[in-house]
Curated annotation (Swiss-Prot):
EC number: 2.7.1.170
Record-linked Gene3D superfamilies: 3.30.420.40
Organism: Bacillus cereus (strain Q1)
InterPro entries: Anhydro_N_Ac-Mur_kinase (IPR005338), ATPase_NBD (IPR043129)
Signal peptide start and end residues: none
Coiled coil start-end: none
GO molecular function, one term: phosphotransferase activity, alcohol group as acceptor
Highest taxon above the source species: Bacteria
Uppermost EC category: transferase
Protein name: Anhydro-N-acetylmuramic acid kinase
Binding site for ATP: G9, T10, S11, L12, D13, G14, I15, D16
UniProt gene name: anmK
Family listed: Belongs to the anhydro-N-acetylmuramic acid kinase family.
Amino acid sequence: MYIAGVMSGTSLDGIDVALVRIEGSGVDSKVKLIHFTTVPFRNDIKSEIQQALSIENSNVQLICSLNFKLGLCFANAVKEVCKEANFSLEQLDLIGSHGQTIYHQPKPEGNMIASTLQIGEPAVIAYDTNTTVISNFRTMDMAAGGQGAPLVPYSEVILYRDPSKNRLLQNIGGIGNVTVIPSQKSDQNVIAFDTGPGNMIIDEVCQRLFQLPYDQNGEIAEQGEVVDEILTYCMNHPFLKMNPPKSTGREQFGEEFVSQLLKRYEKYSKENILTTVTMFTASSIVHHYKGFILPYYEIDEVILGGGGSYNDTLVEMIRYGLKDEKCTIFIQEDIGYSSEAKEAIAFAILANETYHRNPSNVPSATGAKKSVVLGNVTYPSI
């Protein structure tokens, strides 16, 4: 089957689309990436998403309209990846669309029950591309008592399980998440959970203090020094003390967190603040490894992926934090995979599993009561 996986994450960089060919289903799936592209959001669309994400500034009329606008954006992104690959849209069998997360409530709080909302109307995508769309991957896991995240572990087992090596896959997108993948000869369980901020705080600080979308290659962070006072404040965040399985998002580490941090520590240089929040991402990752993984698993390899793996300063901070451990640290590209395409490929794989009616959540990662088939299916017009 030819499937387009579509992902728009918490970083708001744009729409990632992976065109893949998948043979079979389940753990024996054969997956080949044909082409990958990122379609940036228009400035007006990005502004509307940012407004929709704000509890103070959002409204139901905006979210209702944006749901359909993003459906068109996602459909156009699928057309773009096919055009770039010189691949006929009519050959496409399936689209797996994650959607744009507007709010994620992983656990009950007050009178709010656990819930999640991703928008980007699948009916619009299906109609505009004349292709079956699978979307809303998180909701069934949450209906089964899970947190709806992380969802990539299933695809990571298919792609990265090694005959003899125990691996950690660390994704560094807007949020960081880790998947523990025991070797094929191991009888230990796959586990996964969010490790805290990935690029989210780094990018927000860059935009506010340097008027740059992100810290390219970590060049600015390399110039500053870590401020212990700020790092201690960050590392005391309640999320870091929670036991897995757990998930987080912009609600905990987004604009409000950055606003409070910058107001509290405005006396420090902007370079030192950026260096410190970069160290916070690295330290939160290392903290979770040492607290929740390394005491129980003998890890041979750590594989870093996502946009954060291109931040050389961040990667070196992670390496330094793990210098006393026996594991070898790689970037996805070191082993022949694409850091950028990883999550989009994951949702193509999940769409394939749903098409074949196979459960594809990992209860040990999400906390769900049972394995369930993920996603809603939307057929194109006849």
